[in-house]
């Protein structure tokens, strides 16, 4: 099951998993696009309308997976929101907005973990994934509510891995670098109102440090497939950073010798 599977990273992951023989439940709040995506992906995909901030809907989505397939091997807690594109400073932070972002990004992920564990623990196997972000590794890369929510995810994964290890269930997360997904492009279009989608995508792709390539949705889908597969059978509690070196260093801005008087 993939939450937020109707677009962006979730849709790419759904396609990747299906190509490798999985049957996928797309759990998404978008009741218009979700069924269309499931239809495009084929008979191996099934759509379930799910707002992850409402625990009962997460529980129902997991129950649907169990009713349809008899088991849940992989739970990918991918649904997330960024909040306001041009957020206020901390002194003017809207705590209602903060709660909204945390409700989806953190509480929603915990609900997914909880109900996946509910059905995985009895069978002694399963893989749980969560989407984190490099905004949860460094400050200044996103709005405060979003960054704080993403800082929480690796901690949640490590804390819960301790318990799940006892039952043979693995849990990991992925921290992608910026990718011009529909959500990212939509957010930045408010910041760059005169820019085209192609121009915004170029800006986002230009943020990378690893030259000659760029981070794409398929890169995160491949990372998710690896962590969910038996190839990663001894990997748990891990935050797989897919950022082309973005968070590895900060170059010192020394002036060149000819600039020094």
Positions of PLM-derived features:
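Canonical Rossmann dinucleotide-binding motif of NAD(H)/NADP(H)-dependent dehydrogenases/reductases
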Residues: 1-25
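Catalytic Tyr-x(3-8)-Lys segment
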Residues: 192-219
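Residue(s) in the substrate-gating loop at a strand-loop-helix junction
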Residues: 133
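Active-site helix of classical SDR
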Residues: 113, 149, 157
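Substrate-binding pocket helix/loop in short-chain dehydrogenase/reductase
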Residues: 86-90, 94-99, 204
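Short C-terminal tail/terminal secondary-structure segment
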Residues: 82, 87, 225, 236-261
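Alpha-helical segment proximal to the catalytic Tyr-Lys
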Residues: 118, 162-166, 233
């Amino acid at each position: 099951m993939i939450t937020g599977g109707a677009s962006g990273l979730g849709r790419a992951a759904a396609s990747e998993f299906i190509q490798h023989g999985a049957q996928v439940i797309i759990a998404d709040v978008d009741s218009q696009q979700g069924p269309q995506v499931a239809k495009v992906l084929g008979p191996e995909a099934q759509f379930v309308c799910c707002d992850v901030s409402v625990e009962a809907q997460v529980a129902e989505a997991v129950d649907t997976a169990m009713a349809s397939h008899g088991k849940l091997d992989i739970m990918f807690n991918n649904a997330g929101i960024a909040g306001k594109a041009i957020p206020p400073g901390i002194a003017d932070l809207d705590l209602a907005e903060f709660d909204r972002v945390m409700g989806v990004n953190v509480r929603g992920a915990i609900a997914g973990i909880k109900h996946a564990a509910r059905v995985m623990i009895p069978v002694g196997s399963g893989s749980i994934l969560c989407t984190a972000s490099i905004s949860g590794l460094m400050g200044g890369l996103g709005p405060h509510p979003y960054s704080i929510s993403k800082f929480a995810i690796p901690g949640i994964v490590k804390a819960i891995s301790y318990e799940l290890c006892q039952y043979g269930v693995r849990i990991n997360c992925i921290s992608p670098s910026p990718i011009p997904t529909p959500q990212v492009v939509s957010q930045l279009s408010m910041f760059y109102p005169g820019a085209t989608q192609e121009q915004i995508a170029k800006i986002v792709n230009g943020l990378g440090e690893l030259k000659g390539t760029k981070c794409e949705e398929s890169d995160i889908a491949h990372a998710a497939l690896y962590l969910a597969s038996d190839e990663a059978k001894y990997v748990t509690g891990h935050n797989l950073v897919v950022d082309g070196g973005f968070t590895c260093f900060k170059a010192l801005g020394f002036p060149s010798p000819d600039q020094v008087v």
